[in-house]
Amino acid sequence: MKALYMVFVLWVLIGCFLSGECHRAPRGQHGPRRTLAPSTHHRHYHLYPLPDPNHVQFGVPPFLPTSSGFCKPHSLSLYAPPFEIVIQPSSIIVTIPGLILTLSSDPSPQRNCPARTPPRVKANIIPGPITAQLLPKLKIPLIILDDSRK
């Protein structure tokens, strides 16, 4: 969970530093009607179309493949140029152009998808006569406190 917070904080900080709010002229040189000299314009070349910088898109950018071939259909993708954060149930993938950081708890992805989801099991079942008979077969220790000795 700490890794998720670190990725989110990193994403927010990088987004703040790359936004137009952080690129300001030195004090006393701000003129809203004055145009910048051509030598101060920065040209950025991108290999993919840039969306609106003030809008965060949910989904996969058009230049990335939409299917990884693994059985992880439920994933969340946050895309703010030029960064993409893909959050999947068992891994977090952060893609930055020129740098790839992958944090994964499952080193081998699941290749065989189950046909259906396993049935849900209730966690608050009070042991009754049937459950008490099954406990010795399941090799689960059963502790019984006897308060009759006083």
From Swiss-Prot:
Keyword vocabulary terms for this entry: Detoxification, Secreted, Signal
Keyword Signal: yes
InterPro entries on file: SMR-like
Signal sequence residues: 1-22
A GO CC annotation given for this chain: extracellular region
GO biological process, one term: response to toxic substance
Keyword Acetylation: no
Residue stretches spanning the membrane: none
Origin: domain of life: Eukaryota
Places the protein is found: Secreted
Cited function: May play a role in protection or detoxification.
Protein name, entry field: Submaxillary gland androgen-regulated protein 2, isoform alpha
